[in-house]
C-alpha cells in the first residue's frame, strides 16, 4: 500500500512468547506490529500509567508527604508494569500481575480514607490521627477482604469477582473523599481545587471505562475499521483498551493529587503546602518552601502567578 502505510496480515502471526495462556485476549490483534509484543498498543500505552506513577511517587517524596502516598504511587506503578508484561506476552501469570495489584493498590487509598473519615467523625474540625493500632486493624480487615476475594478469583478464574471488588473500592474512595470534602473543607479556594481535581479525575476515569466497554462489545467494528480503512500504522491508534490505559492513568494521577490535598487539610497542616495547577491544567501539591519550575496558576484555568514565573525565568 505504500512505504508509510501497510495492510494488516491476513492470517495470525506467531510471536516469540508462544501460546496464549491468559483467560482474556483483548480486541487488539496479536503480533501484528512486532513478534516481541503481542498487543502493541495495549502494551505501550501502559507507559502513561507507569510514568504518572513514577512522578506521583517522586512528587510525594520531594514535597514531604506521608509515606502512604509513596506506597500509592509504587502500587500503581506495579499495576502498570504488570499490565505491560501481560499485554506483551498474554501469559496467565502476568495477567495476575496486572489484575491483582489493581485491587491491592486500591487498598491503600481505601484504608487511608477510612481512617480519615473516622478521624473526622470523632474529632470534628480538630483532627487527630487515628491511633496506630486502629490504623493497623483497619488495614488488616481491608487486606483480609481483598486477599479472600483474590483467592476466590484465582481458584474459580471468574473475572467478575475481580471487577466487582475493584468497582466497590472505587466507589468507596470516591464517595468518602467527596463526603469529606463537602463536610470538612471550609476554605473556598481549597474546596474549588479539590472539586476540580476530583471531577477531572473522575471524568478521565469514566471515559477510560467507556473505552474499555467499547473494546469488549464492539470488537468486530474496530477490527473492520482498522483493517479496511486505517491500515497500519494508523490502526494502532484505534485500540479502545489502550485508551483505557491512557485515560485511567491520567485520571488516577488527578485523583491522587486531590487525596493528598484532602489529607493535609484533615491533618491541619495545609498551611505548609500549596496546591498549584502547572500550565493551568496539571494539579500538584507542593511544599511551600519550593519554587515551581514551571508556570502555574492557583486554580484550574486560572491566571498565571506572574511574579513566580518571572523568578523562574531569572533563575534560568
Curated annotation (Swiss-Prot):
Residues 1-36, 58-68, 90-93, 157-160, 182-195, 217-228 are lumenal. It catalyses: N-hexanoyl-sphinganine + H2O = hexanoate + sphinganine; sphinganine + hexadecanoate = N-hexadecanoylsphinganine + H2O; N-hexadecanoyl-(4R)-hydroxysphinganine + H2O = (4R)-hydroxysphinganine + hexadecanoate; N-hexadecanoylsphing-4-enine + H2O = sphing-4-enine + hexadecanoate. GO terms for cellular component: cortical endoplasmic reticulum; endoplasmic reticulum; endoplasmic reticulum membrane. The chain crosses the membrane at residues 94-114, 136-156, 229-249. The keyword Endoplasmic reticulum applies. Disulfide bonds join 27-219. Its EC number is 3.5.1.-. Residues 37-57, 69-89, 161-181, 196-216 dip into the membrane without crossing it. Belongs to the alkaline ceramidase family. Alkaline ceramidase that hydrolyzes phytoceramide and also dihydroceramide into phytosphingosine or dihydrosphingosine. Prefers phytoceramide. Also has reverse activity as acyl-CoA-independent ceramide synthase, catalyzing synthesis of phytoceramide and dihydroceramide from palmitic acid and phytosphingosine or dihydrosphingosine. Is not responsible for the breakdown of unsaturated ceramide. This is Alkaline ceramidase YPC1. It comes from Saccharomyces cerevisiae (strain ATCC 204508 / S288c) (Baker's yeast).
